[in-house]
Amino acid sequence: MALSVEEKAQIVNEYKQAEGDTGSPEVQVALLSANINKLQDHFKANGKDHHSRRGLIRMVNQRRKLLDYLKGKDVSRYTALIGRLGLRR
């Protein structure tokens, strides 16, 4: 269920701000979004998996916090990111 090393590297390369950047809000939000999408597919087949659902809710909350932080720091980066990821709001 977790992202493979190749998938993570591809996401980091796509959303990085500078060479060697793995911790910027854009990269973190993109990685969380990919994990969230994978878990949503898992719940279509395993609806009663409440332990994983708790992890999903935690990831959604962490992504929301990072997006709020980015919105407060730089609105243009925030709007560009949610546009690229196809998120609401």
UniProtKB/Swiss-Prot annotation:
Domain of life of the organism encoding this protein: Bacteria
HAMAP family referenced in this protein's UniProt entry, alphabetically: Ribosomal_uS15_B
Protein name: Small ribosomal subunit protein uS15
Subunit details: Part of the 30S ribosomal subunit. Forms a bridge to the 50S subunit in the 70S ribosome, contacting the 23S rRNA.
InterPro entries, sorted: Ribosomal_uS15 (IPR000589), Ribosomal_uS15_bac-type (IPR005290), uS15_NS1_RNA-bd_sf (IPR009068)
GO cellular component term of the entry, any: cytosolic small ribosomal subunit
Annotated function: One of the primary rRNA binding proteins, it binds directly to 16S rRNA where it helps nucleate assembly of the platform of the 30S subunit by binding and bridging several RNA helices of the 16S rRNA. Forms an intersubunit bridge (bridge B4) with the 23S rRNA of the 50S subunit in the ribosome.
GO terms under biological process: translation
Gene Ontology MF annotations: rRNA binding; structural constituent of ribosome
Similarity comment: family membership: Belongs to the universal ribosomal protein uS15 family.
UniProtKB keywords: Ribonucleoprotein, Ribosomal protein, RNA-binding, rRNA-binding
Organism classification: Bacteria, Pseudomonadati, Pseudomonadota, Gammaproteobacteria, Pseudomonadales
